[in-house]
Amino acid sequence: MRAIIQRVANASVTVAEQIVGQIETGLLVLLAVSPSDTSDDLQKLADKILNLRIFPDAHDRFDRSLIDCQGQLLVVSQFTLYADTRKGRRPSFTGAAAPALAEPMVDQFIAYCRGQGITTASGQFGAAMQVQLINDGPVTIILDTAEWQHGRG
């Protein structure tokens, strides 16, 4: 799984001119699933995101997690995180899982985060979405569970 996480003051996602998800202080997670991802990958990624200490403490140091600051989560599925641009000018997305696999994994990710007590909003899988956010920092971090299998997590 791949995720781009952004610390936000607020964020929202709109489908067909209707806001389908919005949060205040917290993290926007752009999430993609690969064909080889497992439930274990999903849980490890969610735990990493929820516990990353990327929110400031009283001394303005990164020392608080989303859980610590009772922040919120907005999860938006984005298969384009698996774009392969090595050949030609049109990206290939063969590294992304098919919707039949990806959609339940994204749903499980959201359910897991909610199960950890995190207020979690989401976009609409497969829809054309407009995402608005106010970056806080900015703080943007890329996570890839495939790298963790090789000792880089």
Curated annotation (Swiss-Prot):
Reaction catalysed by this enzyme: glycyl-tRNA(Ala) + H2O = tRNA(Ala) + glycine + H(+); a D-aminoacyl-tRNA + H2O = a tRNA + a D-alpha-amino acid + H(+)
GO CC terms in record: cytoplasm
Motif extent (Gly-cisPro motif, important for rejection of L-amino acids): 137-138
Gene3D superfamilies from the UniProt entry: D-tyrosyl-tRNA(Tyr) deacylase (3.50.80.10)
Its biological purpose: An aminoacyl-tRNA editing enzyme that deacylates mischarged D-aminoacyl-tRNAs. Also deacylates mischarged glycyl-tRNA(Ala), protecting cells against glycine mischarging by AlaRS. Acts via tRNA-based rather than protein-based catalysis; rejects L-amino acids rather than detecting D-amino acids in the active site. By recycling D-aminoacyl-tRNA to D-amino acids and free tRNA molecules, this enzyme counteracts the toxicity associated with the formation of D-aminoacyl-tRNA entities in vivo and helps enforce protein L-homochirality.
Family: Belongs to the DTD family.
Protein name: D-aminoacyl-tRNA deacylase
Lineage: Bacteria, Bacillati, Chloroflexota, Chloroflexia, Herpetosiphonales
Recorded name of the encoding gene: dtd
